[in-house]
Amino acid sequence: LRKLTYFVAVSIDGFIGDPSGDANSFMRFVDEEFLEFLKTEYPETVSAAGRRFLGFGDDVPNQKFDTVIQGMGSYQLGLDEGVPSPYGHMREYVASRSLGESPDPNVEIIEDDLLGKVRALKAEEGELGIWLCGGAQIAGQLADEVDELVLKTYPVLLGSGMPMFAGVESAVSDFELTSSRVFGNGVVVRKYARLREKE
């Protein structure tokens, strides 16, 4: 099975953005060392516009993911900037009951049975996985399907804001830390694998 990985930026107190979902306070920590990490380890998680701005180029191959799933709130950020396919270098899926028709041929809308679609994507053959881009609502809906967490923890205390998983009621899930890396600017990237009971 392919993995569903929630690769997400988070504050040290566990929020992925302020109460409105704005995560711009994290951007000041994206320095040369961190950009090199993204470029070599997770280049596909940088949008097409971000790749152009940062000089990645379109020829940088995907390393971990070939599919991205995001909720309407996350996707709307790109639409507001006139970008209907922010991750054109991957298969793009947007979970939305309100969007209707896709504004781009590379973007498939998932109107219902989100769990069924994700399980079908995970069952596909392939070496590259599925990136759960966010936001909090879709992460909450897919919490039980997440196989791996990659937390980019920024040295910022937000106090309140958007949680990593919205709408999840006291579901205890165990994960194992599989790797961690500390950057000079205080950012810590930790990777966790879900511990599932053997069937």
Where are these regions (language model features)?
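Enzymes that bind and transform nitrogen-containing heteroaromatic metabolites
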Residues: 1-199
